[in-house]
Each structure stands twice: as structure tokens, then as C-alpha cells.
Amino acid sequence: NIGRDASVTFRQPDASSTALNRIQQGSPSEIFGRLSANGQVYLINQNGILFGRSAVVNTHALTVSTLNISDSVFNDGITNAINQPQDNAAFAADPGMDPNATIEVQSGAVLRTDEGGRIMMFAPVIENRGEISTPGGQAILAASSDRVFLANSDDPNLRGLLVEVDTGGDVTNLGRIVAERGNVTLLGFAVNQNGVARATTSVNLNGSVYL
């Protein structure tokens, strides 16, 4: 948890460095303060994660999930899991995960990455009422109650990772998701898009929005 007047900073060797945080508390994580990193940050809590109205997140990349990631997948790379016949999900639910576990971004919360970064959210229920911004990168909100699959695209015209879920959940966007010259992907059994999901296009780079 990060209180309203508190801050947490990860000082990492470079932008490719990754901090994996497995949160074992019996309740959702609550982030109301500032979270900063010059690299990648993973927040894993099977009970849910809340970004409150005063939350400000600035990282190179951010992954937030109620589904677990195994040590082998984390070490080998999330896009390599699909090539493994016995464990081909990048993220998978543990038996004790709350089937209604939620990732919520409240109105007023701001989540940003550096140029070319990525913000990914995986949970049975995902609700965004805040601002998510990843210039030249990718924003993925994929709702699933069991497994998420990620793969690199062979098509150079497609921006970002390809995403599939086994059993889809509910995604709601009432806020702003902006990926200038990048990609926005909203995926689930029910996708409620009543906010802004925008990916701009430049002369050399095509933006895209996938629902």
C-alpha cells in the first residue's frame, strides 16, 4: 500500500530492469500516493489493486495483475511462455484467487510511462476512470478469470503485443487511455468503452485501438 502523502521509488540500473512484487496481503492493494521507477514494475495481488484518486504512477513500464506469473515465465520472458507446451499462459489464476478480483483506477489517478513503455492490467474485472498514458507504447486492459496469453506479432504494421484470454471477464473504460503512435487493447467477455481510447498516428508509425 502507498498512502496519499507517501511515495515509493525504484532506482533501477536501466529501463529493461524489472522489479517483481508479489503482494501476499489478504486484501486489495491500495495506492493513493506516488510510485516511480526508471525501469519496469510488476504488482501481483490476487485480491485486487486500487489506484486511488490521488495516485500518480510514473514508470518505464507497469504490469498490474491479480493473475499470477510463474518464476519460469518471468525469467524466460512473458512472450516466450506461449512456446512452452506445458505452461503456455503468461499469467494464470491461482486456485485461491477471488473470481471477482478487481483492478480499479479511480477518477483523478494518473498512470504514465516513458516513451515506448507499456501498461498492462490483467484481472477478472478491470475498471478505469482515471488517465492512462503510454506514448509510443501500448496499453493493455485484458479481463480474464483464468489465463492470459501474450505473443509478439510477426506483422511489422501491428504495434505491440498480441493478447488472448481463456475465459474473459469485464473491462470498463470511463476515463482516458492514450497511446500516441502506439496501441490500446481492451479485451474481455464484456468490454464497456464509454471513455476515451486513443492511439494517434504519425508519418512513420501507425497507431491502433483494438476492442
Regions found by a protein language model. Give the residues of each.
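Extracellular and secretory-pathway beta-repeat/beta-biased strand scaffolds
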Residues: N1-L211
